[in-house]
């Protein structure tokens, strides 16, 4: 989980880049911060002949990190924008920026194809194309959706070199963006308390360029004037809370600056976003193993204060009410966590080959399939894959996703 603190040139280290989906809800950002094993000198020389054996040129890593830091900022501030393709099929600006970055890395001479990842992508795409050509050809499917998924998965196959010092620079850039996001949470509340309402970025984006199927303006309580903070540029409060939640996990695991951790914690509670809180809670067992005792003691001492603050501003009451949503159909909690699992289970039980091969790209309704679907719904990626590509497609997609994000021993990011 950790890396040494030395600033000397290191052997390659691995951190993942997880692309965001623009045809379904983006997968939540991982809270893991894995480090890779060193690349053998022979393999390093083969990949980068100009590098010293066993090390990466710091100048190369610095240039790569510069591009990735700028890219990270641009992806965050443009996530509400998308390029319309056909119907509800869109390509997020984030994806366009990612491929632009790939082009820059090609020109820099640092982009490489990771063989194992590439073969796993090829296996899924080949399966999908054969099934759509033979099995789903008559029932119809969305070529645009299939093409979009191919673009998304292909991003997993590309890697670039990195060392520890510049890896830290990328993480620090993420943390600084999270500071701004946390400040925007308080700005959102401040303008509402002042009677100015909450700034709505969608008022300034042409409809056809808005990234659809996200609840950007989300009421805190139905029929009440208050809106949950959206951080202005974030897709919705869940994305904002996940971003801040991951910053809190990174801060505790990596940098351990208590003032930053406190800022993220208060902002996370003030966002009223449940998914970011769940992300932190899911990471807690791993953090307890990593953190020195004095930090654990600080967390234990701060917990009662945070609970009091949470109770005073209504967070605990809100979370209690949200907890009941899991059993209430059409509620946010049900749609986000329960409905995808139920829909996936029903899809696997379809007659004939439907459970194994799926019903075709783009076929999942924008809502509960048993109730005709509803407009404005973004599915969890796993449910979309199971429904449209079947059990076999899911068994090809899941290892690829887990390997690309969580595996160790890759000498690149």
Can you say where each PLM-predicted feature lies in the sequence?
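Loop-to-helix entry and N-terminal half of a specific, functionally important transmembrane alpha helix
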Residues: 67-77, 301-305, 404-413
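N-terminal hydrophobic segments of proteins, predominantly signal-anchor/transmembrane helices
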Residues: 66-81, 98-157
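Hydrophobic transmembrane alpha-helices and their immediate junctions
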Residues: 283-287, 294-298, 388-413
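A membrane-periplasm/extracellular boundary helix in multi-pass inner-membrane enzymes
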Residues: 183-192, 288-328, 347-350
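Membrane-interface helix-loop-helix junctions at transmembrane boundaries of multi-pass membrane enzymes
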Residues: 56-62, 106-119, 251-262, 293-295, ...
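Transmembrane alpha-helical segments and their membrane-water interfaces
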Residues: 103-109, 136-193, 397-401
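Alpha-helical transmembrane segments of multi-pass inner-membrane proteins
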Residues: 172-196, 218-272, 278-289
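Long extracytoplasmic/lumenal interhelical loops at the membrane interface
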Residues: 80-87, 317-389
């Amino acid at each position: 989980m950790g890396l040494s603190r030395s600033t000397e040139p290191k052997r390659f280290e691995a951190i993942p880049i997880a692309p965001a989906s623009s045809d379904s809800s983006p997968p939540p950002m991982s809270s893991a911060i894995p480090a890779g094993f060193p690349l053998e000198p022979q393999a390093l020389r083969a990949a980068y002949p100009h590098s010293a054996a066993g090390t990466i040129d710091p100048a190369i890593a610095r240039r790569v990190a510069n591009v990735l830091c700028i890219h990270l900022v641009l992806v965050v501030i443009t996530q509400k924008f998308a390029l319309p393709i056909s119907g509800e099929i869109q390509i997020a600006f984030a994806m366009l920026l990612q491929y632009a970055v790939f082009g820059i890395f090609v020109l820099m001479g640092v982009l490489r194809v990771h063989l194992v990842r590439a073969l796993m992508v090829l296996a899924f795409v080949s399966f999908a194309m054969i099934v759509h050509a033979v099995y789903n050809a008559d029932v119809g499917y969305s070529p645009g959706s299939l093409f979009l998924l191919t673009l998304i998965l292909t991003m997993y196959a590309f890697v670039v070199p990195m060392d520890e010092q510049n890896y830290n620079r990328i993480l620090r850039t993420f943390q600084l963006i999270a500071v701004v996001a946390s400040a925007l949470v308080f700005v959102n509340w401040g303008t509402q308390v002042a009677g100015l309402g909450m700034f709505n970025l969608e008022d300034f984006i042409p409809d056809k360029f808005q990234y659809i199927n996200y609840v950007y303006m989300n009421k805190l309580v139905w029929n009440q004037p208050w809106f949950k903070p959206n951080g202005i540029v974030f897709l919705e409060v869940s994305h904002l809370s996940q971003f801040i939640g991951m910053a809190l996990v990174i801060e505790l695991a990596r940098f351990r600056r208590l003032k930053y951790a406190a800022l993220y914690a208060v902002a996370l509670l003030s966002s009223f976003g449940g998914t970011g809180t769940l992300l932190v809670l899911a990471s807690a067992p791993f953090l307890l193993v990593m953190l020195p005792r004095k930090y654990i003691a600080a967390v234990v001492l701060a917990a009662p204060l945070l609970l009091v603050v949470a109770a005073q501003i209504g967070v605990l009451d809100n979370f209690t009410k949200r907890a009941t949503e899991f059993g209430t159909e059409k509620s946010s909690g049900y749609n986000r966590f329960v409905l995808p699992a139920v829909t996936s289970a029903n899809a696997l039980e379809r007659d004939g080959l439907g459970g194994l091969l799926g019903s075709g790209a783009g076929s999942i309704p924008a809502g509960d399939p048993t109730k005709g679907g509803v407009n404005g719904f973004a599915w969890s990626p796993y449910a979309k894959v199971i429904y449209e590509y079947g059990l076999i497609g899911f068994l090809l997609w899941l290892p690829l996703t887990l390997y690309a994000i969580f595996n160790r021993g890759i000498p690149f990011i």
